[in-house]
Curated annotation (Swiss-Prot):
This is Serine protease 23. SUPFAM superfamilies: Trypsin-like serine proteases (SSF50494). The keyword Isomerase does not apply. Disulfide bonds join C160-C176. InterPro entries: Glutamyl_endopeptidase, Peptidase_S1_PA, Peptidase_S1_PA_chymotrypsin, Trypsin_dom, TRYPSIN_HIS. The modification Phosphoserine is found at S109. The gene is PRSS23.
């Protein structure tokens, strides 16, 4: 392994040129591309002062820098990329550390990432995230809520959504626990909620056996042991690249014992089945309900997917997923390819337009998140 100094554009083009195979094994089977992935490894760790946990929780974020603004900016240097992928870890006792990372390349391929500048002016954000008719579906009944893939969606005590991505790990948006300056109130005692039937036998009670109302559900909460937030989110808010790094990983104090959804590198939008994405979350206009939606991707940059899936605050942090054919195992598999972040108000060719935005899991981000989960880069060679 050897670090590659200078601009990461060479790694990016190597990835695009040789890092993936043909996206289709057959015309009717959209197939997960095979990537050769970089390695992100810790180099040093420093102890930091305890945070004050004074920030107000934000259930959505916004940015005025749209696709063209994003695409027109230069790639980060190697040193900048290392800074963005370095991360803070917060522990349940309130202590925290900062870990610097190195980026390494195996088999002559790697990854690069674009970021936005803050020079683009934008309109003020509108208060809606619903486009035309509300196309969201509330999921009712334990037969659906407790089964895959809906059972992978969990609720954070700060008000956001998360997705189960390993036996003890939850992927969510960074802004759900950190505002870019400090941690939000309640993060030190952060909990993750799992829907379960309100009654032990899964029924509705003796007097409700014939009721047509949906079965009552409740949340069972598990405390979070530690959280990881990339420095790109913390440092990036100073120059408007933060949205590219709006993701965080939570480690639970004990296993959740549910089926989880693996993470994967986000394919180009044109390779997604039907050009669509899916996600489920706990939108705050439908309290207590898990809300599912799917929609077409309207535009993309290297780090973001722009879409108009109907969503409301509270859905932030939802795992964006697709279902594609896994050639090696000869089976269909869903993977998380992004994290729903929030709303963006964009000037498109002189005409205002608004989007909902998801952070893509790029090869570098995959390598980082996978290492957080596995603790061994050798287990993170397949995206």
């Amino acid at each position: 392994m050897a670090g590659i100094p200078g601009l990461l554009f060479l790694l990016f083009f190597l990835l695009c040129a040789v890092g993936q195979v043909s996206p289709y094994s057959a015309p009717w089977k959209p197939t997960w591309p095979a990537y050769r992935l970089p390695v992100v490894l810790p180099q040093s760790t420093l102890n930091l002062a305890k945070p004050d946990f004074g920030a107000e929780a934000k259930l959505e974020v916004s940015s005025s820098c749209g696709p063209q603004c994003h695409k027109g900016t230069p790639l980060p240097t190697y040193e900048e990329a290392k800074q963005y992928l370095s991360y803070e870890t917060l522990y349940a006792n309130g202590s925290r550390t900062e870990t610097q990372v190195g980026i390494y390349i195996l088999s002559s391929s790697g990854d690069g990432a674009q970021h936005r500048d803050s020079g683009s002016s934008g309109k003020s954000r509108r208060k809606r995230q619903i486009y035309g008719y509300d196309s969201r579906f509330s999921i009712f009944g334990k037969d659906f809520l407790l089964n895959y893939p809906f059972s992978t969606s969990v609720k954070l005590s700060t008000g956001c959504t998360g997705t189960l991505v390993a036996e003890k790990h939850v992927l969510t948006a960074a802004h759900c626990i950190h505002d870019g300056k400090t941690y939000v109130k309640g993060t030190q005692k952060l909990r993750v909620g799992f829907l379960k039937p309100k009654f032990k036998d899964g029924g509705r009670g003796a007097n409700d056996s014939t009721s047509a109302m949906p079965e009552q559900m409740k949340f069972q909460w598990i405390r979070v042991k530690r959280t990881h937030v990339p420095k790109g989110w913390i440092k990036g808010n100073a120059n408007d690249i933060g949205m590219d790094y709006d993701y965080a990983l939570l480690e639970l104090k004990k296993p959740h014992k549910r089926k989880f959804m693996k993470i994967g590198v986000s394919p180009p939008a044109k390779q997604l089945p039907g050009g669509r994405i899916h996600f489920s979350g706990y939108d705050n206009d439908r309290p207590g309900n898990l809300v599912y939606r799917f929609c077409d991707v309207k535009d993309e940059t290297y780090d973001l997917l722009y879409q108009q899936c109907d969503a409301q605050p509270g859905a932030s942090g939802s795992g964006v997923y697709v279902r594609m054919w896994k050639r090696q195992q000869q089976k269909w598999e869903r993977k998380i390819i992004g994290i729903f972040s929030g709303h963006q108000w964009v000037d498109m060719n002189g005409s205002p337009q608004d989007f909902n935005v998801a952070v893509r899991i790029t090869p570098l981000k995959y390598a980082q998140i996978c290492y957080w989960i596995k603790g061994n880069y050798l287990d993170c060679r397949e995206g």
